[in-house]
Amino acid sequence: MGQAPAPPGDAVALLAGHTGEPTEIRLLSDRRGSRAWKIQGPNGAVVLKANRPDGDEARDKTAEMAQEDDHLRHLTVAGALDPDYRVSAGTWDGGRWLAVNWIDGEPLWQALAPARSPEGDRASLRPWLAGIARTWTEHLARMHAAGWAHADVQPTNTLVTPGGHAAVIDYALACGPDDGHRRVPYRGALTHTTAPEIATAVLATPADTHVQAQPAADIWSLGASLFWCWTGQRPVPYDDDLDRLEKLAVIAKGTTTMLRDVRPWSFPELEDAITACLAPDPADRPTAKELTSAW
């Protein structure tokens, strides 16, 4: 096996002022034109992200990296994001990099593994699940109140902390109220959690046209993520051999699997909230603020 790619040296040197001299640098991911590393030091840890200069999507990922940094700044000023989350950003000889504080948590899919078992129906698990959903919606409510949609709500962008709280990451695709300025066109995110109205808009417009995601689309994606990670099945069934546009055409119909037919055990409050989130008409979905009291 080859040696793991190293992060931008100038970024590591600069971040040492935040973490202290690195004691560990570990590659977390290397896919879709970008890489991420965990940099641990005596004073803390950060996630350093950089575009992959030799990747097919290097140019787009460079723009996305700059866009995410811009989004983090705006969301922080709007009070929708903890000011400690963003650490630093800059350029390097291969493009751009961005560093955010490390969040100690595991992706939603792994965290909810105990709930996917019939044995998950126990008194201690219900408030834990409700707490994850509530803290997730509280974060989205702050974004939505500021006029933003995260636009990439999905299991891998939601971490569950040891205390049972949801933490939202990855703001590169977010859609804000000032998106009249030049930006990377939003064309949906993870197919399986794409809201029907986003799927419809993507199918109806050229590939270089920006589709402005609204908060209601986040709510559908929230419901889809909880449905998927609790039941083990995606809410919209389709053949995995279909290409992305064909899958989006199925999603655009607005039909989902009945949750009661696939849930591992009965949890009426959670079921009702997820079902409401997956309403095909955006106007029929609850807001994030309304959801915070439903879990």
Regions found by a protein language model. Name each.
Residues 265-278:
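Conserved C-terminal C-lobe helix
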Residues 33-66:
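ATP-binding glycine-rich loop module of kinase domains
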Residues 143-160:
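Catalytic-loop of the protein kinase fold
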Residues 1-23:
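Juxta-kinase regulatory segment immediately upstream of eukaryotic protein kinase catalytic domains
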Residues 93-107:
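Conserved short submotifs of the Hanks-type protein kinase catalytic core
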Residues 84-96:
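Short beta-strand micro-motifs within the conserved protein kinase catalytic domain, predominantly
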